[in-house]
């Protein structure tokens, strides 16, 4: 990994506890009455103590029966972290491609894409039958490796050199993505992520990050 080079590039954000202030799976678990059990597994997964794929399947299984319509409660309004809209708008105005690569769920990611006008989103799809969660995930699980692969694929699609890519995340599932990017940003992150990041960004307000990245362009 190297510091960001000149001109606009591609920035990939994690979703839960990065673009938004909540862990969606924990809040769905609250609707299902099992938040404490799910939150403990989420915390262990974000520290990197347990396998992400296995932990996700176990947690999602506990969500079986939750009505799809209740998910909307979690996004009324969307719980953005401070400065998110300003950060992304500033980068977009400077010509950047902005994407979301998440081990969370498409139900939420697609709503963020619409709200923020993101260029692409990649996330896990919850299986829903008869208006309720089944407790299963459809298709492949978006884990750390998939995030890194998607970052590279999107950079190639838009003909953006890896040196002009940035990845922003907070947990162990973001590690490979940060390592794959030209610049890895650990946002209010777990210690394991801080150890490998190029930038440790410890303030909640993300608006200053856009300025920092754009300034790096001007100086390069």
Give the predicted meaning of each segment.
Residues 2-126:
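Alpha-helical substrate-recognition element adjacent to the catalytic core
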Residues 75-98, 103-220:
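C-terminal cap/substrate-recognition subdomain and adjoining C-terminal extension
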Residues 1-2, 220:
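Basic/polar N-terminal segments that are highly enriched at the extreme N-terminus
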């Amino acid at each position: 990994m190297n510091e960001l080079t000149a001109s606009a590039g591609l920035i990939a954000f994690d979703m839960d506890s990065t673009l938004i202030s909540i862990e969606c799976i924990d809040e769905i678990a609250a609707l299902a009455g099992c938040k404490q059990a799910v939150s403990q597994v989420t915390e262990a997964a974000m520290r990197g103590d347990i396998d992400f794929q296995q932990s996700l399947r176990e947690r999602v299984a506990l969500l079986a029966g939750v009505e799809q319509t209740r998910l909307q409660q979690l996004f009324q309004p969307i719980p953005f972290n401070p400065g998110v809209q300003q950060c992304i708008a500033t980068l977009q105005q400077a010509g950047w491609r902005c994407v979301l690569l998440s081990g969370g769920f498409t139900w939420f990611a697609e709503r963020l894409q619409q709200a923020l006008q993101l260029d692409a989103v990649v996330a896990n799809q919850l299986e829903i039958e008869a208006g309720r969660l089944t407790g299963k995930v459809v298709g492949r699980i978006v884990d750390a490796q998939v995030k890194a692969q998607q970052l590279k694929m999107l950079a190639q699609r838009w003909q953006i050199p890896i040196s002009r890519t940035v990845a922003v995340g907070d947990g162990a599932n973001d590690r490979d993505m940060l390592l794959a990017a030209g610049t890895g940003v650990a946002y209010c992150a777990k210690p394991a992520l801080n150890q490998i990041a190029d930038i440790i960004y410890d303030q909640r307000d993300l608006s200053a990050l856009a300025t920092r990245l754009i300034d790096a362009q001007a100086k390069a």
